[in-house]
Amino acid sequence: MAHITVDDSENLEKAIKRFKRQVEKEGIIREWKKKEFYEKPSTLLNRKKKALRRKLMKKGRKVSDSRLY
């Protein structure tokens, strides 16, 4: 959970920006959007398989590109 302390002398706008950065860094909004709607287990599995395939393709391209040099 994002938690910041605000001093009396600190500008409120600056504190809000710092809070937003902290929330972004921790991935709270991203996680909330993922869990906003129910996702069937089969759909979840398909999405994970697709992400894994994409990751392996990217890794394969990286390896083949490095061999060219």
From Swiss-Prot:
GO molecular function annotation: structural constituent of ribosome
Biological process annotations from GO: translation
Family affiliation: Belongs to the bacterial ribosomal protein bS21 family.
Organism per entry: Treponema pallidum (strain Nichols)
Protein name: Small ribosomal subunit protein bS21
GO cellular component, one term: ribosome
Keywords: Ribonucleoprotein, Ribosomal protein
Gene3D superfamilies documented for this protein: Ribosomal protein S8 (1.20.5.1150)
